[in-house]
Design a protein with these regions (language model features):
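Charged, low-complexity intrinsically disordered terminal segments
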Residues: 2-180, 184-520
Length: 520
């Protein structure tokens, strides 16, 4: 045997040993959840601004929850920032991503200012996307009123050791917390699809996401708080202070840096855009006009989803029957859409029952994860043949859409995760229609039954599916895929994936050959 082949054999055996060790000892190698249990603070009648603002509204609508759809990125930023400014008791923040960029720093500053007022701030972040942010997180965690915990964290925080830990614990670290919630005083909550970062709040200069949240006020907020507490106190969660050293001096330096940054032209320009947005004024003046909904709740996966033997507790078991129960129309929005054999069968079965079934997802050009598009493309012809309508979001808009907030940057990508059935039952949250959301990541969202709220979500679907935003996908008489652009006169028909370059199309096709669908 040649020396090269010998080295390769030893390397393969070493890698196999690492993987076997990970399978056998992953739980022992993982940092153990050891933070003291803590729970949502008790509600009070009029102790905080949110208590006082909501009291007359909730008295007028007993046992109902107020719900406002946030489909505008600037309004979504304002809802978080302004609600934090009114906090007087607690801020519970749970996110998959929190970027160290303009909007991430501005919202971190709001959390710090709340803590300075005596508000208890709990931040729960997924550790995969917190990589590289230890210095900032440890600085914030040094504040006596702020505690940061990480979901399924790495023991090794950087470098080669972190890479090796990824290999050893590959199965365990593949499970991530995809939840998104911003909960204020136990009275109001923003739940939906947005992470914290410029691209989610119409602040990015290149590509911004079309996304959707729900601002909740009233009883359903208790559901969100219970979800947060279950995760916060689970053994999958570790305080950042146990993974690094806190530095109070670094906190003051970081706050000074962020505060100085708010005076820069970039920040001032963005904040002026936020203030000029019509919907933001409703938050400023507290002239809110929510839907008042009796049948509404926040639902989620269990925090230890990878250990859950009873899959009836998985969120998909709650959501799938709602879609399967459609009688006239099912409209689904998912940026990462990989229905698999079962999902394709469910949607085409509905279509055979004369249910109008439609899906809005990203086109190849608009998708920020081409591998996911390759997973979707496997099922495109079968979906169309089964009567499912497909609409793919374009990377650039037409007409008014081209100059809207969504397309005001150089490009756009869909990030909304929602569906509405029969115009009244629906879901808005973090759950993508793909295998990763079904079985690997934890997810959460708002499930409701209300005609007004359903009509608003249906209108959002219809707008995204319309010619200003999307291509209509179909097969011609010979069964070949075509993309129709109804935004031109006459309509333009594309014979290949529109707006996607040759290399991107080739890459997406090659990715179809890889056995990675379960990871998408």
């Amino acid at each position: 045997m040649s020396r090269t082949r010998t080295y390769l054999l030893y390397a393969a055996l070493a890698l196999l040993a690492l993987l076997l060790a990970g399978a056998l000892f992953a739980d022992r190698l993982a940092p153990r959840g050891s933070g003291p249990h803590a729970y949502t603070l008790p509600l009070q009648a009029d102790a905080t601004e949110w208590d006082r603002v909501l009291a007359p509204m909730l008295a007028e609508h007993p046992r109902q929850t107020g719900a406002i759809l946030l489909n505008d990125g600037l309004e979504a930023f304002a809802a978080r920032a302004l609600s934090a400014r009114g906090a007087g008791r607690s801020l519970d923040l749970q996110y998959y991503m929190w970027h160290d960029d303009l909007t991430g720093r501005l919202l971190a500053l709001e959390a710090w200012r709340a803590a300075q007022r005596g508000v208890r701030v709990r931040m729960l972040l997924d550790d995969m996307n917190a990589h590289g942010l230890d210095q900032q997180m440890l600085a914030l965690d040094a504040h006596p009123n702020i505690e940061i915990r990480l979901y399924n964290p790495f023991r090794n925080r950087s470098g080669v050791r972190r890479v090796l830990e990824t290999l050893v614990r590959a199965l365990r670290v593949n499970h991530r917390m995809h939840n998104k919630a911003w909960i204020v005083d136990g009275r109001a909550a923003v739940v939906g699809g947005r992470n914290i970062g410029e691209e989610y709040f119409d602040a990015a200069s290149d590509t911004n996401f079309r996304d959707l949240d729900v601002l909740l006020m009233g009883p359903a907020v208790a559901d969100a708080s219970q979800v947060f507490d279950r995760y916060w106190n689970s053994e999958a969660v570790v305080p950042i202070g146990e993974l690094g050293k806190q530095d109070a001096a670094q906190l003051q330096a970081m706050v000074r840096h962020i505060e100085a940054g708010t005076g820069r032209a970039e920040a001032q320009t963005y904040l002026r855009r936020v203030e000029a947005t019509p919907g933001v004024q409703a938050f400023v003046t507290q002239q809110l006009h929510p839907f008042w909904v009796s049948d509404i709740r926040v639902v989620s996966d269990p925090p230890l989803k990878w250990r859950e033997d009873d899959r009836q507790h998985w969120l998909v078991r709650t959501l799938a029957p709602v879609v399967e129960g459609a009688r006239s129309r099912a409209a689904l929005i998912s940026p990462y859409f990989v229905p698999g054999t079962d999902g394709t069968g469910m949607l085409t079965a509905l279509a055979r029952q004369q249910v109008q079934v439609g899906v809005v997802t990203n086109s190849l050009a608009a998708n920020d994860v081409p591998a996911v598009h390759s997973g979707y493309a496997r099922y495109r012809e079968a979906l169309l043949a089964g009567g499912v309508q497909l609409h793919e979001l374009r990377a650039q808009g037409h007409g008014q859409a081209a100059t809207s907030g969504l397309f005001g940057s150089s490009g756009a990508s869909l990030h909304t995760k929602a569906f509405v059935v029969d115009g009244r039952r629906g879901f808005i949250g973090s759950f993508n229609l793909d295998p990763r959301s079904v079985a690997l990541n934890t997810e959460m969202g708002v499930l409701f039954d209300h005609p007004g709220m359903g009509a608003a979500l249906q209108a959002e679907y219809d707008r995204l599916a319309g010619p200003a935003f999307s291509y209509a996908v179909y097969t011609d008489g010979e069964g070949r895929l075509r993309w129709r652009d109804d935004g031109t006169t006459p309509p333009t028909v594309h014979e290949v994936e529109p707006d996607a370059g040759l290399w991107r199309r080739i890459s997406a096709r090659m990715l179809r050959w890889l056995p990675i669908e379960s990871q998408l």
